């Protein structure tokens, strides 16, 4: 009964004002459901966020980092990883069912859901038709902590196979800094030039960091 009453206030607040009205602490408490011995769930949620700095830091951390937080065991760690994976799959479904990319913000949110927290550089491509509706997205190349080998011909081959007319390129920087490197700019130029021969248009190249991003299109580089 004690644990149920602890959740009563966040639940009532959600039902009355909507889920977006909850603070990060209240939202986390809603997912955790229970506290630990001598610590209610709201206190536990507050301590977890203070320890990891933010929801982002919490949801992208590894189990070893949880060992220093009293009351956090395998079960609660699994709950949190489940939340992160649920969000990632939600954006996957949303991309398929809301075929057009409705806005640059939606594109960025989708890419962040796919690439945030990866320990290696991943290069992915969103393939679009002539009306800029999403056909599919693919992770085409994976690399190391700070490098990924990208082959323009493989991108073009995939685009031709699915009859794509336009592309959005994306990759992550596991270091957290989204600022593109000289190599990032050079490979983007190579891909654009290669695509021009096949009448394929590159709309953007988005680099995902830790809580930040850089859009080549927004910078005026494409």
From Swiss-Prot:
The keyword Chloroplast does not apply. Zn(2+) binds at residues 171, 173, 184. GO terms for molecular function: metal ion binding; metallopeptidase activity. A motif (JAMM motif) lies at residues 171-184. Keywords: Hydrolase, Metal-binding, Metalloprotease, Protease, Zinc. GO terms for biological process: proteolysis. Residues 100-222 form the MPN domain. Gene3D superfamilies: Cytidine Deaminase, domain 2 (3.40.140.10). It comes from the Bacteria. CDD domains: MPN_DUF2466. InterPro entries: MPN (IPR037518), RadC_JAB (IPR025657), RuvA_2-like (IPR010994), UPF0758 (IPR001405), UPF0758_CS (IPR020891), UPF0758_N (IPR046778), UPF0758_YicR (IPR022820). HAMAP family: UPF0758_YicR (MF_00018). Belongs to the UPF0758 family. YicR subfamily. This is UPF0758 protein YicR. The lineage of its organism: Bacteria, Pseudomonadati, Pseudomonadota, Gammaproteobacteria, Enterobacterales.
